[in-house]
């Protein structure tokens, strides 16, 4: 039969890796704009800065960026309860409870809502 060369396998694997969700997580805003976005509620803004900002406001982290509708839409289609469950259990590079052990389910819903909305909806 056919012998597949290791170099060909490696090239195929690299091509597929370029199609991963994190590779399509291109920011719609500049880094400065992403870093400036905060929830209007001061308490929630503090939680966001402490638990979410590092990954969700920095391109290349693999996390859906704040305001990146294309990245958030498939996640939102799972429903809020499923998203909150994923946050609480951890997913991929996100640790359980998303570095917010004191967050309530309502806090997670508010944070998801903030991060998944376009900037003009804030």
Q: Can you name each region flagged by the protein language model?
A:
Residues 1-18:
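Sec-dependent bacterial lipoprotein signal peptides
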Residues 19-23:
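Bacterial signal peptide processing site
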Residues 63, 86-122:
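Axial heme c-ligation environment in periplasmic c-type cytochrome domains
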């Amino acid at each position: 039969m056919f012998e597949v060369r290791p170099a060909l396998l490696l090239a195929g694997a690299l091509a597929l890796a370029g199609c991963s969700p994190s590779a399509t997580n291109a920011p719609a805003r500049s880094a400065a704009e992403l870093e400036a976005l905060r929830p209007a509620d001061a308490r929630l803004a503090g939680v966001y800065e402490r638990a979410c900002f590092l990954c969700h406001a920095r391109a290349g982290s693999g996390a859906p960026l704040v305001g990146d509708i294309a990245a958030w839409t498939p996640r939102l289609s799972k429903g809020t309860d499923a998203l909150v469950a994923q946050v609480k259990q951890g997913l991929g590079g996100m640790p359980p409870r998303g570095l917010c052990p004191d967050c309530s389910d309502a806090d997670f819903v508010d944070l998801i809502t903030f991060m998944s909305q376009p900037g003009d909806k804030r």
